[in-house]
C-alpha cells in the first residue's frame, strides 16, 4: 500500500468469466463472484485538546474530540466524532489524553483507543451538558442519545433543517 503512487483502501478480487459469474449469482448486497479485502486503517498518535458538543439537524447532541492536528493517510485530522456519551465512557476519553486516531473506512476520523501514559494526571470524565450549547434549551435523553428539546427555536436545528430541505436528497 505504501509503495503505490496513489491511495487505495483495499483490493477487489473477482471472477472474470461471465458464465461463472452467472452460476455463482448474487447475495443480497453483493455478488458471490467478487470479494473485497480492505487494508487495516492507518493510525497515528495525537492528543485530545478539548471535547465539544455539536447539535445536529434532528437535535441530537454529539460529543466531538478536538485533536492536536495529525496527518493520517495524507489528510490532516483535527476533529473526531465520539458518537455518544456511552461511547466516550466506554473508551474513557478525556481532555489531555493521548489517543490513537484512524480514518474509519479510510474516510471518517475516529479515535481507535486511548493510550495510557505512566504517571499522567487525567482530567475529570466528560459529561453531557444539561442545556443545549446552541440555544440553552433543556436536554433530553433517549437511550444512548441526548437531544435538544428546543426544536425550531434551536439555531443549529433550524439551520440543519433548511440545509436538509434544500439538499438534493430532500427537495428533489
Which sequence ranges carry the predicted segments?
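RNA/tRNA-interacting regions in translation and RNA-turnover enzymes
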Residues: 1-172
